[in-house]
Amino acid sequence: MISQISIKTKVGWITAFEQKNKIIKVKFIKKKNSLISNNLKKFRSELNNFFAGKHKSINCRVLLRGNSKQIKVWKELKKIKFGKTKTYGEIAKKYKLSPRHVGKICSQNEILLIIPCHRV
């Protein structure tokens, strides 16, 4: 069963979807809250602290759903510190992929903000 929480932020509504107590998707939409777990409550707190400037990342339990290349790239994105960026080329070189392939993998990231594809 998938549960969800919607949070109003200064950039609009953000909804996190969870399955098996792990976040599987974050979208910029508003949905009706359902079965709010401790992990979703933590996401709400982390998100609010992130936008308040108290935290530099959002740390919650996530379930990465993808192939091995996607998961490697997404884990690499998670390592990019707040205020820093990397290029598609830098990540591609590390995993012997083309920059376009890395770009495509970034576009398939469903866990926005937690996996910071906006830093690439």
Spans of features found by a protein language model:
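Short Lys/Arg-enriched helix C-cap and helix-to-coil transition segments
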Residues: L113-V120
